[in-house]
Amino acid sequence: MANAASGMAVHDDCKLKFMELKTKRTHRFIIYKIEELQKQVIVEKIGEPGQTHEDLAASLPADECRYAIFDFDFVSSEGVPRSRIFFVAWSPDTARVRSKMIYASSKDRFKRELDGIQVELQATDPTEMDLDVFKSRAN
């Protein structure tokens, strides 16, 4: 189904991998890419359950936009193990203006396809995705 604002479709695999992350916890993160020629969002990379936020940050290109889902496990201030599903809108300052516009205009529609996102994080460089940022946003 295409997005009226940006004309982007969402590949079925995007939702399937998200459901696997959410229900089976078979992935730590998913990186999504917009294929401009096919006008659709596709899965670019899957993170294994043992990987961390550092692996996610290292997997994002330095000069291209992406969307990512991150399953963040943490211990609450009460000492209770918790988990939050983050949506990361990665838009580095060095990305092309056209790319930033396409990702920005498609974001809300894409997020609606992924039922169960709990926290959104906008990041323009890896320092905006360090552990303290995830912890502070998760509570």
Curated annotation (Swiss-Prot):
GO biological process: actin filament depolymerization
UniProt induction comment: By the root-knot nematode Meloidogyne incognita.
Cross-referenced SMART domains: ADF
Localization: Cytoplasm, Cytoskeleton
Residue ranges annotated for the ADF-H domain, each copy included: 5-139
Name of the protein: Actin-depolymerizing factor 3
Domain of life: Eukaryota
InterPro entries membership: ADF-H, ADF-H/Gelsolin-like_dom_sf, ADF/Cofilin
Function noted in UniProt: Actin-depolymerizing protein. Severs actin filaments (F-actin) and binds to actin monomers.
UniProt-listed Pfam families: Cofilin_ADF
GO molecular-function terms, A-Z: actin binding
Keyword Cell division: no
The family this protein is said to belong to: Belongs to the actin-binding proteins ADF family.
Species whose genome carries this gene: Arabidopsis thaliana (Mouse-ear cress)
Keywords: Actin-binding, Cytoplasm, Cytoskeleton, Phosphoprotein
Primary localisation category: cytoplasm
UniProt GO cellular component terms: actin cytoskeleton; chloroplast; cytosol; mitochondrion; plasma membrane; plasmodesma; plastid
Sites of Phosphoserine modification: 6
